[in-house]
Amino acid sequence: MIRHFLIPFLLTAFAWAGLSASANASEIASAWAEEEQATVRLVASRDGLGDDGVVRAGIEFAMQPGWKVYWRSPGDAGFPPQPNFDGSENADISPLSWPVPLRFSVLGLETLGYEDSVILPFTVQAADTAKDSMVSATIRYLTCKEICIPYDAQVSMTIPAGNGAPTALAHIIGKFDSRVPRTASAARLNISEAWTEHSEKGLYVVANATSEIPFKGPDLYLEGPVGLGFGAPATRLSNAKQSATLRIPVSG
């Protein structure tokens, strides 16, 4: 049954505090890998490994107006950025974190992704804090507007050994980190039940959700096997806006 392999993410409104970078803060980043439609680089939130050797970092994309890159489950078309960190030294790289995507609808195709700019955060763990950490990546990505163009970007940066202070990029990495969906318990919400419905109009996934904090524009992103597509939900909220029923069309 579909409900067995779908992984739901119910997303509430995200807020973050505006943080000001110090005028004296350094910047740890790779050079930009530049293309006509998009540029990409690596960025780090600290200018040294510190005692624990753990540094939050990210892949930063900057797109020309109208161009986009894709979320980890892109929808009806496209593929997400695919980094390969095999060339890194003294750096264990965590899986990417994925901020809340935007929905795009073109010619009946529903896709999920990012426009303008985005940082996909990850964590660097150095095995030896007495040595520099070199983060090297080959990033394959697809950027689309009326047409889609694939690129392979080569980028690398060095995070020095020693005490680490926040870089000039720490606040922007933190901003996108705050947009990454939290677990249901951390967000104080619960999907109490989910089921499938068949009708003359097609197949739907329906989910009931409750939240301790009133919902504001809730959305539901579903992930499933290649070949299945999931549209934007039709949402019905209770009067207090602390419970919601979301009905998602399934195609494919």
Language-model features: locations:
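Positively charged n-region of N-terminal signal peptides that target proteins for export
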Residues: 1-5
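Extracellular/lumen-exposed scaffold segments
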Residues: 23-252
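Bacterial N-terminal signal peptides
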Residues: 7-18
